[in-house]
């Protein structure tokens, strides 16, 4: 992991191409596949931005995160072979919990989908929740970009203007 002093809060960004095998017969990204695109993008972003590989972390420590809740809105279809912009940010962090907001946009910046994902930190061997280490909590506190809206639909209204 990068030194915490070298990390600053930011919205993480990447791009993805909507692939054939992920689409329905109408050439739209299948609703179930949005989660895969969001999670894959987030994992890659965290690895690139913070040099933090969650799979190495899990293998080395026996700890990891499980999804406890997702809220997702599908606003505009993502189309076969379309390039989309993926954004994510940590919006909330507590000792055993993090919430991440992820957005899929077209190349003009228009919102296609919004996801709030909540994760619980767990000891995989004991199947019990566990507090983040001081080092992880310090990282999360440093990179967290809280949002004003605490309700998903209110946030959707703010982001989906125009």
Predicted segments with their positions:
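Terminal targeting signals and extreme-terminal segments of soluble enzymes
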Residues: 1-80, 95-99, 103-162
């Amino acid at each position: 992991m990068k030194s915490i002093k070298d990390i600053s809060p930011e919205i993480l960004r990447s791009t993805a191409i909507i692939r054939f095998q992920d689409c329905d017969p109408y050439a739209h990204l299948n609703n179930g596949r949005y989660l895969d695109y969001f999670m894959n993008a987030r994992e890659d972003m965290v690895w690139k931005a913070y040099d933090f590989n969650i799979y190495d972390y899990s293998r080395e420590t026996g700890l990891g995160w499980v999804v406890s809740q997702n809220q997702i809105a599908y606003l505009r279809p993502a189309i076969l072979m379309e390039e989309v912009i993926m954004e994510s940010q940590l919006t909330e962090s507590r000792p055993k919990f993090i919430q991440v907001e992820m957005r899929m946009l077209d190349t003009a910046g228009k919102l296609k989908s919004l996801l709030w994902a909540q994760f619980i930190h767990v000891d995989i061997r004991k199947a019990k929740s566990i507090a983040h280490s001081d080092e992880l909590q310090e990282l999360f506190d440093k990179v967290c970009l809280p949002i004003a809206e605490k309700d998903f639909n209110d946030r959707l209204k703010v982001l989906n203007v125009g």
